[in-house]
Structures are given as C-alpha cells and as structure tokens.
Amino acid sequence: MSQKACYVCGKIGHLAEDCDSERLCYNCNKPGHVQTDCTMPRTVEFKQCYNCGETGHVRSECTVQRCFNCNQTGHISRECPEPKKTSRFSKVSCYKCGGPNHMAKDCMKEDGISGLKCYTCGQAGHMSRDCQNDRLCYNCNETGHISKDCPKA
C-alpha cells in the first residue's frame, strides 16, 4: 500500500481515485476550497505524516525512526539487522522552497515558489510544466537537447 496520502481526503492507505470522501482543504480540513485558496494560516494540525501515519505533524518533524533499508520503524538503516539493500529512493524535497523532508503541499513557506528550480531550463522561480525556455542538457549544460541525446556524451 502506498505511503503517500490521498489527494482528496489526505489519509494514507488509498489513492484519490479510490476515495469516496468529499474533497477537503489540505490545510484546514474543510470542504469548499483547496489549500492554495485557503485563508487560514498554514498549519500541520490536520496533515498526516508520510513516515508514521499519525496526524498533527509532517515527515520533517516526525520523531519516529524508520529504517530506509527495511522500511520498518524503531531503528535506522545503519542499525538494521537485514542485509543492506541498494537504495533506489531519492530524498524527498520540496518543489516550492527547495527544502528537504517535505513536499510542496506540506510547505510552511508563504512566499510562493522562489526556491523552485525548473528541471527543464535550470532557472529558479517556476516548474518544468510552466517553462517557456528550451530544454537544458544535464550533461553539457547547453540548451536544445537533453542528456540522452547529448552530442558530447
């Protein structure tokens, strides 16, 4: 089962497509609007932690230890009794502020997307889906192609 919260009700354990709940604001937990239109101050009171599943805090504030090797709680990976696995997980980072251990919808920053870096052009302040610039190659940092098509690779 997915550790990510449902985008409709905010609860862990199912996906939005399977949710029967009325859509609630992710910030204040009330119907009729979404978080971006919420007039209430940002809060974690109704948010559900992706690490432990409890409400009232987000992953970056969670005190429950979770092993990145076996995904069990109570210990961290360097203390894990299971054989070490090659990690294919990327660290969670916020697309809004660039900070670690939380996602944009959990971000407490009010000042828009200033820390956001576009994956298409590499500039700050917008996301790839809104980019008007040419693609930037991660290999040579030139525009017009992506790394898999790089002539310098």
Curated annotation (Swiss-Prot):
SMART domains to which the protein is assigned, alphabetical: ZnF_C2HC
Keywords: Cytoplasm, Metal-binding, Repeat, Zinc, Zinc-finger
SUPFAM superfamilies membership: Retrovirus zinc finger-like domains
PROSITE patterns for this protein: ZF_CCHC (PS50158)
Zn finger limits (CCHC-type): 4-21, 23-40, 47-64, 65-82, 92-109, 116-133, 135-152
Compartments it resides in: Cytoplasm
GO cellular component labels: cytoplasm; cytoplasmic stress granule; P-body
UniProt superkingdom: Eukaryota
GO MF, one example: zinc ion binding
GO biological process annotation, one example: positive regulation of cytoplasmic translation
Chief place where the protein resides: cytoplasm
InterPro entries noted in UniProt: CCHC-ZF_NABP, Znf_CCHC, Znf_CCHC_sf
Gene3D superfamilies in UniProt: Zinc finger, CCHC-type (4.10.60.10)
Function statement: May act in the sexual differentiation pathway.
Miscellaneous comment text of the record: Present with 96655 molecules/cell in log phase SD medium.
Identification of the protein by name: Zinc finger protein GIS2
Organism: Saccharomyces cerevisiae (strain ATCC 204508 / S288c) (Baker's yeast)
Lineage of the organism: Eukaryota, Fungi, Dikarya, Ascomycota, Saccharomycotina
Encoding gene, per UniProt annotation: GIS2
